[in-house]
């Protein structure tokens, strides 16, 4: 059975207009969504000791994620402040990861052995694991990273040589700009898969240099929080599972689109 790990960020998303907080974070969301698809999933990250940390940890535990290698520190858990504009989530503030930034992950020998037991390790630009990427690359069979809307040249050059799948958010970019960005990412070292999500315009995915496109299934969204994470999760678990069986990606995608899930 496929096994996946979210490595890095966990936060609470504080909806300021409703005074409600929800568990989140790219790495944690990946693990949770995979678990919802019936995949064996774990999460490795840093928790604080405040109410937000307790809420996130308890939720992840209730969902039966493997949390056996997580770290715990005194301090404020990561949080993001959010508002909704016509169903589109807008980030208006954060504490930049809280304890995750103050006490970044340092992978031990036991951690590296742990990573080797997973088919996919997914992390993000918000996880403060850049220094650990060479070790993650050595330990894990398949490494994925969400770069959000980052176009910083130095940062991309630093991280991409260790990544099998890079995800970027391109909702405000033109098609030509996206294609150029995909090629740049490939030139900087991530030559296998690049996922470019475009919100209501669908997604572009480059697999070994071949470009695929998926049109969106348009809905009246009430909240777009986690939409990109769920797309990335669905794509990766279907892609890697198919490749383990040596099936061809174009055949696998078929009428299900590039995520492998029916619209």
Model-predicted regions and their roles:
Residues 27-36:
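Histidine-anchored nucleotide/phosphate-binding helix
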Residues 12-17, 21, 39-120:
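Conserved N-terminal subdomain of the carbohydrate kinase-like
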Residues 1-5:
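Extreme N-terminal starter segment of soluble prokaryotic enzymes
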Residues 6, 69, 123, 145, ...:
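General beta-strand structural signal in soluble alpha/beta enzymes
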Residues 120-184, 201-202:
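Conserved beta-alpha-beta core of the PfkB/ribokinase-like small-molecule kinase fold
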Residues 9-10, 230:
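Active-site metal-binding loops of divalent metal-dependent hydrolases
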Residues 179-263:
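Conserved phosphate-binding/catalytic region of the ribokinase-like
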């Amino acid at each position: 059975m496929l096994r996946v790990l979210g490595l890095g960020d966990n936060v609470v998303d504080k909806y300021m207009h409703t005074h409600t907080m929800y568990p989140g974070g790219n790495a944690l969301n990946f693990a949770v969504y995979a678990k919802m698809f019936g995949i064996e999933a774990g999460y490795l990250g840093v928790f604080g000791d405040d109410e937000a940390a307790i809420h996130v940890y308890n939720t992840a535990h209730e969902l039966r994620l493997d949390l056996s290698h997580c770290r715990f520190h005194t301090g404020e858990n990561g949080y993001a402040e959010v508002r909704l504009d016509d169903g589109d989530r807008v980030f208006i503030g954060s504490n930049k990861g809280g304890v995750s930034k103050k006490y970044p992950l340092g992978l031990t020998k036991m951690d590296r052995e742990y990573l080797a037991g997973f088919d996919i390790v997914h992390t993000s630009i918000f996880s403060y694991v850049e220094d650990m990427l060479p070790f993650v690359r050595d330990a894990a069979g398949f490494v994925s990273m969400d770069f959000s809307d980052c176009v910083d040249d130095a940062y991309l050059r630093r991280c991409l040589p260790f990544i099998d799948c890079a995800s970027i958010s391109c909702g405000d970019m033109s098609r030509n700009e996206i294609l150029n960005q995909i090629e740049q990412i490939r030139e900087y070292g991530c030559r296998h898969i690049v996922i470019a999500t475009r919100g209501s315009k669908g997604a572009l995915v480059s697999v070994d240099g071949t470009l695929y496109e998926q049109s969106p299934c348009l809905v009246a969204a009430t909240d777009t929080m986690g939409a990109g994470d769920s797309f990335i999760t669905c794509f990766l678990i279907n892609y890697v599972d198919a490749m383990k069986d040596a099936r061809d990606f174009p055949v696998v995608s078929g009428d299900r689109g590039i995520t492998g899930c029916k619209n």
